[in-house]
Amino acid sequence: QLNAEEIEKEMQAIAETGLEEVLILTGESPNKSSVEYIGEACKIAKKYFKLIGLEVYPMDSKDYAYLHECGADFVTVFQETYNSDKYKTLHLGGRKRIFPYRLNAQERAIMGGMRGVGFAALLGLDDFRKDALATGMHAYLLQKKYPHAEIAFSCPRLRPIINNDKINPKDVHEPQLLQIICAYRIFMPFASITISTRECERFRDNIIQIAATKISAGVNVGIGGHSQEEEKGDEQFEISDGRSVDEIYQMIED
């Protein structure tokens, strides 16, 4: 875990790359990353970035309201799978096992004042077509209820996980991923669609011309990876597109 001084250095290092938006991530344990700790990180980030997004554990509306006051604008929650039976087999303990609480996190974030929310299933955990459909309907229904809210989709699929070679994705290859992204674009034409660095350069270069509206750049998934020579903790997943912010910018311009 980074302290306030280390967070400041990390934010400075990221801002120096030219990025104007930042995503703050934590694990699923409030004991490791309290709401107050995340709020402090948001206050620091606000000095350097125009938009602050959160990928953190689900919270109550009052906690989202506090983080919004600290500077957070956007909340993304990965439902992982919308198959509640499958979900139970993946989460045997802790707060994350409560399926409805996670499912309703985006609405609580909107009620807490967040200007936008993001949706995603981890494609490949279960039937990816059913999960993609459920993700789309989840976002659509919230958009109807809260028309002022900005809606975004992320499209992660199971990829190689560091220190784990037993994951067996259920056939979510690039053609299927493209189909899902295009379906989101047609179904909700004003939604944002983000493609992460888990996907390869070629796919990201092409999808930005077809349907995606946002791609990450200069990503380092190690804790303190932008500002420290020796990162704290392990990386979570492998990066397929390791290009810098300048390289991504040049690709988009070209």
State where each predicted segment sits:
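A general structural detector for well-ordered alpha-helical segments in enzyme core domains, enriched
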Residues: 7-10, 37-41, 63, 101-105, ...
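Catalytic cores of alpha/beta
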Residues: 60-69, 115, 125-141, 200-210
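Alpha-helix N-cap and loop-to-helix initiation/capping positions
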Residues: 2, 33, 37, 93-101, ...
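Auxiliary Fe-S-binding modules of radical SAM enzymes
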Residues: 133, 143-254
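Core AdoMet radical
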Residues: 1-10, 14-109, 115-119, 125, ...
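Short alpha-helix boundary/capping motifs
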Residues: 73-74, 95-96, 137, 212-213, ...
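Amphipathic, soluble alpha/beta structural segments
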Residues: 21, 38, 42, 46, ...
